[in-house]
Amino acid sequence: MVKLGKKEQQKYRTEGYDLDFISRVQPQGGIKFNEKYIAQGDCYVACLHVYSLAEDIPPLWLTALMNNKDTISSVDVATANKEEVVKDINRSITELKDRMTSERRSTDRDDAHWELQNLTDFARSITQQGEIVKLVKLRIYIYDPVLEQLEKRIGDIKKEIAGQNYKAQVYVFKQKEEWQTLFASYDDQIEYLGVKSGYPLPSKNIGFGIPFHHQDLKDPRGIYLGQTSTGGAFILDPFFSTGTRTSFSGFIFGKMGAGKSTLLKQLEEGLVAKDCFIRGFDKARDYYTVVQQQGGKIIDLSGVQDSEEVETGMINPLEVFATKITNTGAVDEKGSFIQHISKVTNMIRFLNTEFDDTVIQEFRKHLYAFYIEWGLVPQKGSDRPYKVTGYPPNHYPILEDFYKYLSNLKLEAGATPQRHRDLEAIKLQVEDMITVYGDMFNGHTTLKNFENEQIVFFDIDGISKYDKSVFNCQLFTALTLIWSHALKNGRQMKYLREEKNLSIEDVKYFMVFLDECHNVINSQNEFANRYVLEFEREMRKFFAGIFFATQSPQEMLPPPGSTVDVSTMKAIFELTQYKIFLNMDNSVLETLKSVLGESLTESEFRILPELKRGEAIVQVSSTETYNVMFDPDEKQLERFKGGQ
């Protein structure tokens, strides 16, 4: 760095320079102007000069040019001399009229005619409608600590804006002047720096360009999660409804270590503070510390208690929970029972994949008849009210009771030998559930006052070590229980709201968290997929939502070329209101596009692999997308230990 002598310092001070101020703000390490870039002590800089604009300028066009990540943009605007503008237009009109008759190719004559019409309209707006013409200079200053990376970024930005019909270039041997324009007015640039006049534009085009916009999200009753790329607060309430935000579910994608679990815990902690009911599944045991500090419960569905911190409990697979509602918001008893029969049938199907449709039909028939004999379901033609949900746990049969029923069952006369074999196969399967997995399947529900607990997480690590079929059975049972709790809370809140006895601030919401959700929804778990999809559709009316998190769609989708139907999984994603994309690997982008469609722009897809840890593209609605840096404080990170 050059050090000035005393005489030089005195000279500059006499001329009015504040040398102390300059010393504080000057580039540390000095500055050197090279042919195509500027070298500073800590980075390299290049000025990309926009020298040609699109023929048809769209709304918000300046935003696209001046809101590039890690750049500084400048726009210089001056008012053009009206007489000179009109004179230039007249000259151009004369030239275009000549081209309309002299050009040999018809396409060139058509182009000249089109340009003439545009120019004539422009001239009329100036002379008759009071349009004011502005002169505009647009510059994008790109910086990077690595010269090669700077050159790559210049190429990327040029390619991006070229796709919108703008042209830009780094002016060779002009980098010093381009740097100085940052500190000079438009008139000084023209007079002292030898800069050419700006690009003429109607003032209305600048008006709807809106380049210097500021993004923030400040939901009433929201949770502070981080800051937007423009420094605005990002305060999100997933239960806040607007004209474009109509449901309460969300999806989080991001590779390992990108910040998925930390974000979910930020959200969970904020919702707990709002007195929201929380339910979730934890496979990696990431939530133990958080849930314990909040006074919640962790339940191991495997029936094995390997820690004092964890409760074990049985959920009776034959207990009927309320999972269906009518249009008035009441429990649909018959619909809930039919869905319950479907759930138990699928449990049997998963436990024995060799059962064909005939065996399954036989099982369903006997199960339905068993509930009639037990007294829960009225006989056909009976005028007895249909009531199967909401009874105490010991009011329901257990698998052992069903096995006794099957053992005493006599098929009607004339039943085929195949039906007898099917009945024996069903009895054998139920007996296996009782003897081998009795701790999980054979007994009344033992979780007391479970539905009134604010925070409950199911540890599915234990059951994930069992056969896939057993895992699915317990998973579906837990999902049914969660659905029942959400319905009960939602119906109460809905009734109080409709009776105007509860303000929106006092509503108690219900949120389900599915971290590492590929363990639950995937191409091999179609029943769970359909169950979760139905939950999404129904729960919106009852102040409930569900948040999913996984590394990429590849974790859930079948391999390329598979004939497995993935429409249900795509529907689950499409129904989510909030879509959050943390850093993702290049290799999954094509799969992501196949699932997302046009949810993100091409430029947003391209920056996903470049996002820093904790940084995300957040889509709140079809018209609202934010670039957010989530920033939990040190105390939160200490509480969130385990999972990032």
Swiss-Prot record:
Gene3D superfamilies: P-loop containing nucleotide triphosphate hydrolases
InterPro entries associated with the record: P-loop_NTPase, T4SS_component
Keyword terms, alphabetized: ATP-binding, Nucleotide-binding, Plasmid
A GO molecular-function annotation: ATP binding
Residues engaged in binding ATP: G254, K255, M256, G257, A258, G259, K260, S261
Descriptive protein name: Uncharacterized protein pXO2-09/BXB0008/GBAA_pXO2_0008
Origin species: Bacillus anthracis
